From Swiss-Prot:
PROSITE patterns: TRUD, UPF0024
Protein species of origin: Pyrobaculum aerophilum (strain ATCC 51768 / DSM 7523 / JCM 9630 / CIP 104966 / NBRC 100827 / IM2)
Gene Ontology molecular function terms on file: pseudouridine synthase activity; RNA binding; tRNA pseudouridine(13) synthase activity
Organism domain of life: Archaea
InterPro entries, A to Z: PsdUridine_synth_cat_dom_sf, PsdUridine_synth_TruD, PsdUridine_synth_TruD_CS, PsdUridine_synth_TruD_insert, TruD_catalytic
Any Pfam family matching the protein: TruD
Annotated gene: truD
Keyword NAD among UniProt keywords: no
Top-level EC class as recorded in UniProt: isomerase
Protein name in UniProt: Probable tRNA pseudouridine synthase D
Boundaries of every TRUD domain copy: 167-370
Catalytic activity: uridine(13) in tRNA = pseudouridine(13) in tRNA
GO BP field: pseudouridine synthesis; tRNA pseudouridine synthesis
Record-listed E.C. numbers: 5.4.99.27
Amino acid sequence: MLEAPSFDKMLGMFYYATDTCPSGGVIKRSPEDFVVEEVLLDGTVIATSGVELRPRVGNWTWIHVVKRNVDTIKLVLRLARALGLSHRDVSVGGLKDTKAVTSQIISVRGPVANLPQLPGVQFLGMWSMDKPITPSQIYGNRFTIILRDVERISCAEGALEALKKTAAPNYYGYQRFGTIRPVTHLLGKALLKKDPHLFFEVMFCKIFSRESEVAKRAREAACKGDYAKALELFPKKFVEERVFLKRLAGGYDMWNAIMAIPPQILRVYIEAAQSYIFNRFLSIRMEIGPIDRPVEGDLVEINRQIAYYAEGLGGEVVLPVVGAGVRMPRGKVGEALLRVLREEGLDPSAFLKMPRGLRVYGTYRRVRLEPAGFEYKIMGNDVFMQFTLPRGSYATVLLREVVKPAEPHKHGF
């Protein structure tokens, strides 16, 4: 197995499936280079060009949204505010990449007469429905991607051919954690440990060279306790920082100031901590043996049921996404995973001890990532790719196998 660079290891991704040379290249040179189209369970593609859905009588409105360079959670909050609704009355089937052109369904409670004009957002259709859109109604996403300015085309082609034969590890990708500020999981760990001072330190005192000068100055001011100056400096797009600082400036204690941050954002932090631990689990499982073959103690998925592997049983290897209510593998796999939890100072029950709305249950995730309909084309120094991935899997994990970036942000990740 080829070892990953230090940045990847910081996010729990220790290995590559392919042993090809780094191709280099840049993703997301423009948002149009990274197109994501939601795919419903019945195979319907929510295409950027439009889609026809069959309406149903009910108290929900499904809206076809195409967004460009817009964060999904912030779009939900803006849409709820514009329609005079609670954010709980607006739902999505999944978060989509921000720096991209993405097409998906957003549902809102009740009828909608007029939709607002929002920068970077197009509304292409509306249908009355009997239920909200939820992750369980989504199969996955179709990706159309251009990797530009590839430095070593032969390396790219070698990796792409290898990925036709070899599954990639189903890591959670870079965008789950951040590449300019890779701290989302650290904020989540601070929340799970109920350590508000650590949360503050990570948010404001951990400053990265890749950040803008304005953001650096704002964080420095906040870290020194000058909340008013930090609020002046932070642009409005820094929603969570500004909410936190306003409450601190207003005399709130630190924990209650954190709890004023929109719950959707806090939940992202907690889920990022889950993702980091899963990545560490998967890296350890790769050390134990090939991930396409179960070993004693493994958990496997058979007909959507989770069971302990037994000789001749077959099944697809899964690992727990740690949280309340999940089983751990047995034997040397289970022992290694429990060691990770001890090192991180986390207990699965911590996910259930969070305030209401932030409680996260555990689940299981397949360890192998195999794209459907995978095709690519070399165009000079660019590579065009199209494929479909199941819900929760990351296109950037496949692209990582091709580019093998030491500093992901320099390659558009």
